[in-house]
A protein has these predicted regions:
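Extended, loop-rich substrate-binding clefts of extracytoplasmic carbohydrate-active enzymes
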Residues: 1-49, 111-120
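Acidic (Asp/Glu-rich), glycine- and aromatic
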Residues: 25-32, 39-82, 206
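Beta-strand-rich recognition/accessory modules
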Residues: 29, 61, 66, 86-160, ...
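Terminal, non-catalytic domain-edge segments
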Residues: 143-160, 360-449
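Low-complexity, Pro/Ser/Thr- and charge-rich linker/hinge segments at domain boundaries
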Residues: 144-165, 206-239
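Non-catalytic terminal regions with compositionally biased, polar/charged low complexity
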Residues: 151, 166-171, 177-178
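Extended acidic/polar, glycine-enriched regions
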Residues: 172-219
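Catalytic cores of extracellular degradative/oxidative enzymes
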Residues: 219-395, 401-410
Length: 449
């Protein structure tokens, strides 16, 4: 399901809803009229328009634009970039997953926290002016059909590794990169981080987030340098100690960092976890403790990590795969509980079901596919993240968890959504998260899983 949201001071004056055709109308104190319609026939259409009637005795006014909110429980993938846009929602048809591909034919879209701003967050209107957004949707079983609706000039990858270049074939369009005119179809390499690409065509401007990603070891090494420079075992966190342990394995931190990590973990584990503590932070603390305790021949640290891990809820994503790893590495030491064949509960987090399917060897299952979808890597990225569910943007933490869960998914295999290989999707997610302005220690740690 989807709905249209408008801000104050719009007032709803008409609402007609049915299974096949729904329409709404709002008025603004300045005299502007906003209408929206969702119509289902051979294709599904979403139309939204704003009009300032002629003869209104007012100068140009700015009014809030309408926001399309995909509020389905299953995450929708969004690429809203100005003159072009694509949204892929998920539905169920005859007990088989299906995709609804929404293509923007008119409008000036952008991704906001609630969903898709159809005409911009603020719209300037003079008497006699109007603005129109039109999206058309169709069902498909293959994400490849959605990708075929992307602009032909769009680079194959919008976030790449250093020192790669990207190519934007736009013979009849103007190009701006970070606000400066660009005369070549080849872009980059640019400094590490996110950049703005704007393409000006007759239909309008398309704004694309592009980026150059650091490699994972470089990102981890930079963060670990910060941790070591101000190291205090009384204030460090479990995820930070995981990063220290990982950095030594990546050879971007000295071996002495392991001893510091042990000291930090002993301090963290000297206190019980609080009810307000982040689940992933607790998870990483436990895993760092049992792994580091085993490596450093510290049975007390190892056993405390295992004990705490087995106390964590299996209803939270990440617990199951952590127990799998512990059981594989320390088979004779883990607590003797029956837990591998736990049955999925009603209303359980789909990511938990995906984790259980993947880590019990059922990658070719509908449950496992959920982790592939939550990588958020099928469409080009947008600022803030590309997935939306139940009226809000899905957090980066979910993508980082999905990246960790799919570590054991054979890279050459695909999913039921279509042809992109899971290994390629995981790399896209990794690059997207690494170019984020600020990546939490928990998220960065999950990327080293």
């Amino acid at each position: 399901m989807s709905h249209i949201s408008v801000g104050q001071p719009w007032t709803l004056v008409s609402c007609q809803e049915s299974a096949d055709d729904s329409s709404w109308m709002w008025t603004h104190p300045c005299g502007a009229v906003l209408s929206a319609r969702l119509r289902q026939s051979d294709e599904v259409e979403l139309i939204a328009g704003i009009t300032m009637p002629p003869g209104i005795d007012t100068a140009e006014m700015t009014v809030p634009g309408p926001i399309w909110i995909p509020d389905d429980p299953l995450p929708a993938a969004v690429w809203a970039a100005g003159a072009h846009g694509l949204v892929v929602t998920r539905t169920c048809r005859d007990e088989h997953p299906a995709l609804m591909v929404w293509r923007q034919d008119m409008g000036d879209s952008c991704a906001v926290d609630e969903g898709v701003s159809l005409l911009g967050s603020e719209i300037a209107l003079a008497p006699g002016n109007s603005r129109l957004a039109l999206w058309r949707g169709r069902l498909t079983d293959d994400i490849g059909e959605a990708l075929g609706s992307l602009p032909a000039w769009l680079p194959a990858e919008t976030i790449v590794d250093q020192p790669e270049e990207m190519v934007c074939h736009t013979p009849d369009a103007g190009i701006l990169v970070d606000g400066a005119e660009h005369t070549s179809e080849t872009i980059g390499p640019l400094p590490v981080g996110a950049h703005d690409l704007a393409i000006y065509e007759s239909r309008g401007a398309t704004r694309v987030l592009i980026g150059w990603s650091p490699d994972r070891a470089t990102a981890v090494g930079a963060r670990v340098d910060e941790i070591l420079s101000g190291f205090d075992p009384r204030t460090v966190t479990g995820p930070q100690m995981w990063l220290l342990m990982s950095a030594v394995g990546m050879r971007v931190a000295p071996f002495s960092a392991l001893e510091m990590a042990v000291e930090g973990l002993e301090n963290v584990l000297s206190r019980p976890f609080g009810s307000a503590d982040d689940h992933v932070a607790r998870l990483l603390t436990c895993c760092a403790a049992f792994r580091l305790g085993h490596r450093m021949s510290d049975p007390e640290l190892r056993d405390e990590g295992l004990r705490r891990l087995w106390e964590l809820s299996l209803d939270e994503p990440g617990t199951f795969m952590s127990r799998c790893i512990a059981s594989a590495e320390l088979a004779t030491l883990v607590p003797e509980h029956v837990w591998v064949n736990v049955v999925s509960g009603e209303g359980e987090d789909p990511l938990v079901r995906a984790e259980r399917a993947i880590w019990t060897g059922r990658c070719a299952s509908r449950d496992a596919d959920e982790a592939v979808w939550e990588l958020g890597a099928f469409l080009p990225t947008v600022p803030g993240g590309p997935l939306y569910a139940q009226g809000h943007r899905v957090s980066r933490r979910r993508a980082a968890l999905a990246h960790a869960m799919t570590t054991v998914w054979p890279e050459e295999l695909t999913s039921s959504f279509g042809s992109p290989r899971v290994g390629e999707l995981r790399q896209r997610t990794l690059r997207r998260l690494l170019v984020s302005e600020h990546l939490d220690d928990e998220d960065l740690a999950l990327l080293t899983w």
